[in-house]
Curated annotation (Swiss-Prot):
Residues 47-86, 143-173, 746-766 are annotated as: Disordered. Homooligomer. The gene is Fgd4. Activates CDC42, a member of the Ras-like family of Rho- and Rac proteins, by exchanging bound GDP for free GTP. Activates MAPK8. Plays a role in regulating the actin cytoskeleton and cell shape. Promotes the formation of lamellipodia. Its main location: cytoplasm. It is found in: Cytoplasm, Cytoskeleton; Cell projection, Filopodium. Pfam families: FYVE, PH, RhoGEF. It comes from Mus musculus (Mouse). Keywords: Actin-binding, Cell projection, Cytoplasm, Cytoskeleton, Guanine-nucleotide releasing factor, Metal-binding, Phosphoprotein, Repeat, Zinc, Zinc-finger. The modification Phosphoserine is found at residues 702, 716. Detected in thymus, lung, heart, skeletal muscle, small intestine, liver, kidney, spleen and testis. Expressed in all parts of the brain and in the spinal cord at embryonic, postnatal, and adult stages. Levels of expression are lower in postnatal and adult tissues than in embryonic tissues. This is FYVE, RhoGEF and PH domain-containing protein 4. Zn(2+) 1 binds at residues 565, 568, 590, 593. The keyword ATP-binding does not apply. Transmembrane segments: none annotated.
Length: 766
């Protein structure tokens, strides 16, 4: 863009004198704009030109905001004229267009006329506190026209350079940038003063707002009291006088609600109404509250009987149809807001803490020197005492509301709505099934005196859960179990039932154990029989002791842990010999061994299916038949696995039969015999292999499974396969000793006995 040629000095001087004279003659009458020019004149008297022109950040005092006297009618003038007017910045800052004018005026001081000229050069826009306000007037437009008429030569100026300012077209962003800089400095002092003035006004306004809020909430509260007293109470009393139910029940529910309503509607509310009308002359509320606060003691009677009143409403609604009909009819009305009677009964309980909160806020805004300070402080002390009782009742009511929600979630089948019941924790959890290895979704509700073990109910409407078991806190014990296949597990052992549960995470598990422990400890503290609830895994046996049979729910042995009846040792199958659990000891038995019933104390004395042994212990009947002497196969797997040279699952194949997974054990007490079980908890071995004399082949063929080995003797061939090479070598180490009659501890007694036999019998050796 081409730069404008500098204007001659004579033209510039002539333009200045004509403009100054026009401005003085035009604003001699003292308009709003002239006062603004005077302000600019005072602020620029001591400023020199180099400081003003060279440093845009240094400006005069902030200009005052003024309104135009006339509507902007000449804003759509010739663009060239308007553009020249817009080139001036707010607050009297002038930027030189070219170096010649700056050098001519470097040593001159800014005169009042120059300040007037600067302020009037751009009357259309001013930036004040970050806001741009239009200030174009008819008078201001005439100034521009007069300026143009007095210019003798058009060559003395170019568009946008009336006062030596840079052209807008040349540097379009410079104007806005300079305005932002000077506004940041000029408005600082003004903002500080405004903020101080605003804070002073805000405290007074907030005191008025608090008093207004107290009045408005008091009006709404009185309308709720009228609903309780004049609608619910009167309608139910009318129905009671008809003989539908005793009137005494209605009086117990509403207590002294009529007295409370009379106090607020006839005394407190009228006093507040009158005071707010006189607020300009008497801006205080502490004296009213201090005078009437002692009457709030009448709430003590209402709060004291609140729990029983809510429980009575629930009972009457369930058992008396007329009571239910009247309350439901009122609750349908618009004035109730679709809220229940219990909800409206909570209003007086919540009102006292509301007074306390508003009064505390009022004292924070009130100056200690105020005449209302002492009255407000005394009234707060009285109200705080009453509020402490209300807060306790509110907590109980909130807990009761939660109990009602749970009551509905359970299909209104469990009687849990009782003020003595307190919800401690709830949440989803997984239950490890005894009949299979699956984890089933469950939901727990932990209260201060019981645990509800629930099953989710999949329905669009109605209840969400079904209570499967209610386990009492009394006698409950917790065990933190460790299961590699199922992490984050723990066991709840109660008189009614034992549950093995799996949490979603270790943190969730710890939270449940902590909540259960605290509930158990608190329960025993209330009954003065404190004892630790969390015990180590070894502190609680997996099986119920003989003394506790029928008194404590057992832990059920999982179906996949056994393959045969734990009493008669017969193998299970899906058709003729299915699995059953003894409800007394938790063992898995067949139908023959569970064909007994006994009364179990933990199940309320009801008859339950039990095994033969438990039946004899619980009922006291003894079997005269002597127990059979156990054979070699009748050694329990758990008995030998705990004291063995080696034990693990192995794949096993005999002759042309398919591979099957079995539990193999070489016990320390019989190290030359390999016991094979269907599962680790089986009480009887499926087969045994005396290892002495067998040939070991640890080089499997290509058709065999990896990590396999064979035991061969005559026509008997037993094939085994381990899960990995390490486990295979562990087995081979023990078996290679056993086939030669040796043990890890030394020569076997079996081999010594064999060597002492007569000659002919030594043919059995390999």
């Amino acid at each position: 863009m081409e730069e404008s040629n500098p204007a001659p000095t004579s033209c510039t001087s002539k333009g200045k004198h004509s403009k100054v004279s026009d401005l003085i003659s035009h604003f001699e009458g003292g308009s709003v704009l002239s006062s603004y020019i005077d302000l600019q004149k005072d602020s620029t008297m001591n400023l020199n030109i180099p400081q003003t022109l060279g440093q845009p950040g240094l400006t005069s005092s902030p200009p005052r905001k003024f309104l135009p006297q006339h509507s902007p009618q000449k804003q759509e003038n010739d663009p060239d004229q308007t553009q020249g007017q817009h080139g001036c910045l707010a607050n009297g800052v002038v930027a030189a267009q070219n170096q010649m004018e700056c050098e001519d005026e470097k040593e001159t001081t800014l005169s009042p006329e120059m300040a007037i000229q600067t302020a009037a050069a751009s009357p259309d826009t001013h930036v004040l506190n970050g806001e741009r306000n239009e200030t174009i007037t008819d008078s201001a437009s005439s100034i521009a026209n007069s300026h143009d008429e007095n210019a003798s030569d058009s060559s003395c100026r170019t568009p946008g350079t009336d006062l030596g300012l840079p052209s807008k077209e040349g540097e379009p962003g410079m104007d806005a940038e300079l305005q932002e800089r000077e506004n940041g400095v000029n408005t600082m002092g003004l903002d500080t003063l405004d903020q101080h003035h605003e804070v002073k006004e805000t405290n007074e306004q907030k005191l008025h707002k608090i008093a207004t809020e107290l009045l408005l909430t008091e009006r709404a509260y009185v309308s709720r009291l009228d609903l309780l007293d004049q609608v619910f109470y009167c309608k139910l009393l009318e129905e009671a006088n008809r003989g539908s139910f005793p009137a005494e029940m209605v009086n117990k529910i509403f207590s002294n609600i009529s007295s409370i309503n009379a106090f607020h509607s006839k005394f407190l509310l009228p006093e507040l109404e009158k005071r707010m009308q006189e607020w300009e002359t008497t801006p205080r509320i502490g004296d009213i509250l201090q005078k009437l606060a002692p009457f709030l003691k009448m709430y003590g009677e209402y709060v004291k009987g609140f729990d029983n009143a809510v429980e009575l409403v629930k009972t009457m609604t369930e058992r008396v149809p007329q009571f239910k009909s009247v309350t439901e009819e009122i609750q349908k009305q618009k004035i109730c807001g679709s809220l229940t009677l219990q909800h409206h009964m909570l209003e007086p309980i919540q009102r006292i803490p509301r007074y306390e909160m508003l009064l505390k806020d009022y004292l924070k805004k009130l100056s200690p020197d105020s005449p209302d300070w002492n009255d407000a402080k005394k009234s707060l002390e009285i109200i705080s005492t009453a509020a402490s009782h209300s807060n306790s009742a509110i907590r109980k009511m909130e807990n009761l509301k939660k109990l009602l929600e749970i009551y509905e979630m359970l299909g209104e089948e469990e009687d849990i709505v009782n003020p003595s019941n307190e919800l401690i924790k709830e949440g989803q959890i997984l239950k490890l099934a005894a009949r299979n290895t699956s984890a089933q979704e469950r939901y727990l509700f932990l209260f201060n005196n019981m645990l509800l073990y629930c099953v989710p109910r999949f329905s669009l409407v109605g209840s969400k859960f079904t209570v499967r078991t209610r386990v009492g806190i009394d006698g409950m014990k917790i065990v933190e179990t460790h299961n590699e296949e199922y992490p984050h597990t723990f066991q709840i052992s109660g008189k009614e039932r034992t549950l093995e549960l799996q949490a979603s995470s270790e943190q969730d598990k710890e939270e449940w154990i902590k909540a259960l422990q605290e509930s158990i400890d608190a329960f025993h503290q209330r009954h003065e029989t404190f004892r630790n609830a969390i015990a180590k895994e070894n502190d609680i046996p997996l099986e119920v002791s003989t003394a506790e049979l029928g008194k404590r729910a057992p832990r059920w042995i999982r179906d996949n842990e056994v393959t045969m009846c734990m009493k008669c040792k017969e193998s299970f199958n899906a058709l003729t010999r299915r699995r059953h659990h003894c409800r007394a000891c938790g063992h898995v038995v067949c139908w023959k061994c569970s064909d007994y019933k006994a009364q179990l104390e933990y199940d309320g004395g009801r008859l339950n299916k039990v095994c033969k042994d438990c039946y004899q212990i619980i009922s006291g009947f003894t079997d005269s038949e002597e127990k059979k002497r156990r054979g070699i196969l009748e050694i329990e797997s758990a008995e030998v696995s705990g004291n063995s040279e080696v034990c693990s699952f192995l794949q096993y194949m005999e002759k042309s039969k398919p591979w099957q997974k079995i539990w193999c054990v070489i016990p320390k007490q019989d190290p030359l015999v390999l016991y094979m079980y269907g599962a680790p908890q089986d009480v009887r071995a499926q087969a045994t292999i005396p290892l002495l004399g067998y040939v070991v082949d640890d080089m499997p063929k290509s058709a065999d499974l990896p990590h396999s080995f064979k035991l061969t003797q005559s026509k008997s061939v037993h094939s085994f396969a381990a899960d990995n090479e390490e486990l295979k070598q562990k087995w081979l180490k023990i078996i290679l000793l056993a086939v030669t009659g040796e043990t890890p501890d030394g020569p076997s007694e079996h081999l010594a006995t064999l060597n002492n036999l007569p000659g002919p019998k030594k043919k059995s050796e390999c």
